[in-house]
């Protein structure tokens, strides 16, 4: 028995009405969904840490999510694991005509252009009337914003140079500050303007060839690393963070930054 069949058999036993696991038998598509998201992020974390032993395990956990959905779908007569494999195989062959068909592609740009053309044709066949119809609302907000912007760009709704993109960021900053300076701040309006500013910043990242979600993840990691070092230095001086003034913490923060630059 190959390992895929072994995994499928394990999943079937876990869901068996007679001898299965009580917890696994109670699960539904909706109840499993949060675990799928969690496992996806754990895969990304292992990749970021370049921990490939851990990555092997996390990919297994993610694969188990797919198998879980397949088992539940099979029980309801919707589809099974083979149908999932067939669907992705068909899609890959269809979207790579330069490999499995008669067309040619000279570089990655040719591939991506053709890929988007094929996706547009597929959306038309599904009676999707907007270029934005199949963008999942459950995507992380930065990722979804960038995907929306890319789809709009694919149909020509986009600036062709960086200048207007940067100008838009400054415009949105001005609008945020206008709301901040009101005698009575309208929090709903301020939130709206902050959203516009973040959206414009994501668009700037896209025009610069940067993935906003990844950039922010790295910024989070950098800030966390530096703050932990600030905590360590403050503790080494025999002090508590809550008892140190902001000026001292800023001094230590700058020291940590200089140490990183010198490495």
Short names for language-model regions:
Residues 1-58, 64-194, 198-263:
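Flexible "arm" and connector segments at domain edges
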């Amino acid at each position: 028995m190959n390992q895929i069949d072994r995994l499928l058999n394990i999943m079937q036993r876990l869901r068996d009405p007679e001898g299965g696991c009580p917890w696994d038998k109670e699960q539904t598509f909706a109840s499993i969904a949060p675990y799928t998201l969690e496992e996806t992020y754990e895969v990304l974390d292992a990749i970021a840490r370049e921990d490939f032993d851990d990555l092997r395990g996390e990919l297994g956990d993610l694969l188990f999510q797919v198998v879980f959905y397949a088992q539940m779908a099979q029980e309801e007569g919707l589809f099974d694991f083979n149908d999932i494999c067939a669907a992705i195989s068909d899609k890959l062959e269809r979207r790579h005509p330069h490999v499995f068909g008669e067309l040619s592609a000279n570089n990655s740009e040719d591939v991506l252009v053709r890929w988007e053309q094929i996706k547009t044709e597929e959306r038309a066949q599904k009676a999707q009337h907007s270029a934005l119809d199949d963008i999942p609302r459950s995507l992380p907000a930065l990722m979804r914003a960038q995907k929306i912007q890319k789809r709009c760009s694919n149909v020509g709704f986009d600036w062709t140079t960086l200048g207007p993109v940067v100008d838009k960021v400054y415009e949105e900053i001005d609008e945020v500050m206008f709301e901040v300076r009101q005698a009575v701040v309208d929090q709903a309006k301020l939130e709206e303007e902050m959203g516009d500013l973040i959206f414009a910043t994501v668009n700037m990242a896209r025009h610069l060839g940067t993935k906003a979600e990844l950039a922010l993840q790295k910024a989070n990691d950098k800030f966390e690393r530096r703050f932990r070092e600030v905590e360590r230095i403050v503790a080494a001086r025999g002090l508590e963070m809550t008892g140190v003034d902001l000026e001292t913490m800023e001094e230590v923060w700058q020291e940590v930054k200089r140490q990183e630059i010198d490495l």
